[in-house]
């Protein structure tokens, strides 16, 4: 809705998207602490690797996931350079020569060089990710919060899991992403009343509850309807309680900037080339 006019209808959730999911039980058994800075993350990865466990599973062969480590922490870039998003969107700034972005890319490569993403992470996909978690072969991975339930359902593990923010660049920002699948009515339709009626139908409490109850990937729907029975996971509520609302005010990079999504795959290829020593960070 903009200026009291309906342009599209978005039915989506408000769950944490692509944060760090970790094996909480494994952490507790080994006395590992959740890292809040890059230095702490690197030290943690070293301790995990000593146990023969992949610290941070990175499915490079998927081609689209490893970029999230860079894009999901948009708030840390905006914090370092206030007004960056506006400058990027008006072609007054670029990723190149941005100190914080270069810092994050170099940290990513440092972890890659150390083997903390797993052996041949560039050639590994996420097909077996739930089993990797269930078998305790890995300790952490970027995933949506609902993935925790999928791990338990797929593997039967009794381990508990939790979430924390991606700490590259000493990030403390939540990956706010106010974008999702949206339904639109055709402006030139001869059946405008039917479009409106359909929108009214799918936004009734009963319809929204039906959508939520039959969508395994959803634990909630982000709608202005207090009558909906949400299914928040305890892990989600625990994680969200650790994030201050002031740290939710900046969108992820791919939503806050106009062109990032268009170059998503190319950026991912460049990240791989950088990690392989075929490209400089400033050229990514």
Give the location of each predicted region:
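Short, solvent-exposed loop/beta-turn-alpha elements that line the ligand-binding surface or hinge
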Residues: 1, 77-103, 153-156, 165-176, ...
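Hinge/lid segment of periplasmic solute-binding proteins
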Residues: 1-19, 33, 42, 48, ...
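Periplasmic solute-binding protein
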Residues: 2-34, 60-89, 177-186, 262-272
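Short helices/loops that flank or line small-molecule/ion binding pockets
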Residues: 26-27, 46-51, 127-137, 141, ...
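Extracytoplasmic/periplasmic substrate-recognition and gating elements
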Residues: 29-30, 114, 153-217, 252, ...
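Short helix-initiation/N-cap motifs at beta->coil->alpha
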Residues: 38-43, 120-134
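Glycine-centered hinge/linker elements that transmit conformational signals in sensory
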Residues: 45-47, 90-121
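C-terminal capping/gating helix-and-loop segments adjacent to ligand/active sites or protein-protein/ligand interfaces
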Residues: 176-177, 219-223, 237-284
């Amino acid at each position: 809705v903009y200026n009291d006019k309906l342009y599209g209808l978005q039915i989506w959730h408000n769950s944490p998207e692509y944060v760090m999911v970790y094996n909480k039980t494994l952490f507790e058994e080994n006395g590992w602490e959740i890292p809040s800075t890059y230095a702490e993350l690197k030290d943690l990865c070293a301790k995990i690797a000593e146990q023969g466990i992949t610290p941070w599973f990175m499915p490079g062969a998927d081609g689209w996931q490893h970029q999230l480590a860079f894009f999901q922490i948009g708030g840390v870039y905006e914090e370092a350079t206030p007004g960056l998003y506006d400058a990027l969107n008006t072609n007054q700034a670029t990723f190149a020569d941005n100190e914080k972005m270069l810092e994050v890319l170099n940290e990513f490569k440092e972890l890659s060089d150390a083997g903390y993403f797993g052996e041949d992470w560039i050639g590994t996909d996420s097909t077996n990710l739930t089993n990797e978690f269930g078998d305790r072969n890995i300790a952490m991975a970027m995933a949506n919060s609902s993935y925790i339930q999928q791990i338990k359902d797929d593997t039967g593990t009794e381990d508990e899991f939790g979430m924390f923010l991606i700490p590259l660049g000493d990030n403390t920002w939540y990956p706010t992403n106010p974008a999702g699948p949206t339904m639109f009515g055709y402006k030139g339709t001869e059946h405008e009343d039917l479009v409106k009626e359909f929108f009214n139908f799918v936004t009734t409490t009963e319809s929204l509850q039906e959508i939520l109850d039959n969508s395994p990937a959803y634990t909630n729907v982000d709608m202005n309807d207090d009558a909906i029975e949400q299914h928040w996971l305890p892990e989600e509520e625990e994680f969200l309680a650790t994030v201050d609302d002031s740290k939710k005010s900046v969108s992820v990079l791919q939503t806050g900037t106009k062109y990032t999504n268009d170059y998503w795959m190319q950026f991912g290829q460049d990240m791989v080339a950088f990690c392989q020593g075929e490209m400089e960070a400033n050229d990514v």
